[in-house]
Amino acid sequence: MSENQDLQKSFLETVKFDDKGLVPAIVQDFETGKVLMMAWMNRQSLEMTLEKKKACYWSRSRQKLWLKGESSGNMQNVHDILIDCDGDTLLLKVSQTGGACHMGYQSCFYRKTKDDLSMEICDTLMFNPEDVYGKQS
């Protein structure tokens, strides 16, 4: 299919969901380009995101839609949604309120390896998760 023919298809027709009906979504800060998180979307969460311009994902652990920030207040306003060349990965460019990570950090990628293979924190703690979500067992 030529590039021009491909652009004639609708965005939703182009997305290749996996055998579970999911597609990975990489989430990036609209202003800085910093990668904030990776989450899964199904068709319903993607349609809701397109309609509301607020990020909505599919929670594999809870098996339900997850409007980012509904319990924490750390919403993601969606500016752009890009699709990769294979159609099987999305990139959401968002304005993030508060931290993206449920551990309280700006990004879920808040740890990096050191030369000795230990890890160090490399991100900003935005909130105390116990204050937002309560004590985790």
From Swiss-Prot:
| Cofactor, free-text remark | Binds 1 Mg(2+) ion per subunit. Binds 1 zinc ion per subunit.
Q: What does it catalyze?
A: 1-(5-phospho-beta-D-ribosyl)-5'-AMP + H2O = 1-(5-phospho-beta-D-ribosyl)-5-[(5-phospho-beta-D-ribosylamino)methylideneamino]imidazole-4-carboxamide
Q: What does the entry list as the binding residues for Mg(2+)?
A: D84, D86, D88
- Report the subcellular localization: Cytoplasm
Enumerate the InterPro entries for this protein: PRA-CH, PRib_AMP_CycHydrolase_dom, PRib_AMP_CycHydrolase_sf
The record's GO molecular-function terms, alphabetically, read: magnesium ion binding; phosphoribosyl-AMP cyclohydrolase activity; zinc ion binding
Q: Per the UniProt record, which EC number(s) apply here?
A: 3.5.4.19
Family listed: Belongs to the PRA-CH family.
Full protein name? Phosphoribosyl-AMP cyclohydrolase
State the organism named in the record: Prosthecochloris aestuarii (strain DSM 271 / SK 413)
